[in-house]
Amino acid sequence: TEGAVLWVVTNEPLLAFEGFRAAAVERTPIDAVHFPAAEIARQLDRIYEVAKGDDTAGFAIIFSSARQEGSRNIMPSLTLGLNSLPPGESQRPHRHNSVAVALVIQGEGCWSTVDGRRKDWSPWATTVTPPTAVHSHHNGGTKRALFLIVQDGGLYYHARTMGFSFA
């Protein structure tokens, strides 16, 4: 069997900033969810079957619960997605108002460019792309790149200020 990685991301900084505490389990708008690896792989393969256009930012699966499905968030304030990039391809430079915190799952020969600076990837590293930074991801390797990204996108979604644009 393979090992496991526990990567924990919460909205605790937001709660602390506002002086709040997490709601009791019975009152929370968050559901426990489980996404089996086989289903994630199946969905990712389906995405790759769809032709990529110039207005496509990349290949991604967005994770959500039944109660958060309408906003496409995993929590009211957080968005979680598995992004992917085919071997030998580069993602078109873009920006958005939310921060992007990424866990590199598979990324040999991959890197990101953030505000003109190259950041090489390493396995299981966490990278941070600041809000509004122009960035792109590049796969110079021979395998599909996989990176799990959490963003404070829920806040921007509810305020209608996502600010996504190609650079």
Language-model-derived ranges and their functions:
Residues A16-G81, G163-A167:
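A short, N-terminal "cap"/entry segment at the start of jelly-roll beta-barrel domains
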Residues R144-A145:
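Ligand-binding pocket scaffold of soluble enzyme catalytic domains
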Residues E18, N139, A159:
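Short glycine-/acidic-enriched loop or helix-start segments at secondary-structure transitions
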Residues R72-T79, P86-A100, G116:
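A short beta-loop-beta micro-motif enriched in histidine and acidic residues
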Residues T1-E12, V114, D120-G141, V150-D152:
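Conserved metal-binding segment of the jelly-roll/cupin
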Residues T1, R95, V99-P123, T161:
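A short beta-strand-loop-beta hairpin characteristic of the jelly-roll/cupin
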Residues N83, G153-H158, M162-F166:
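Non-heme Fe(II)/2-oxoglutarate
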Residues W7, G81-N83, A102, L148:
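Conserved hydrophobic/aromatic positions in well-ordered beta-strands
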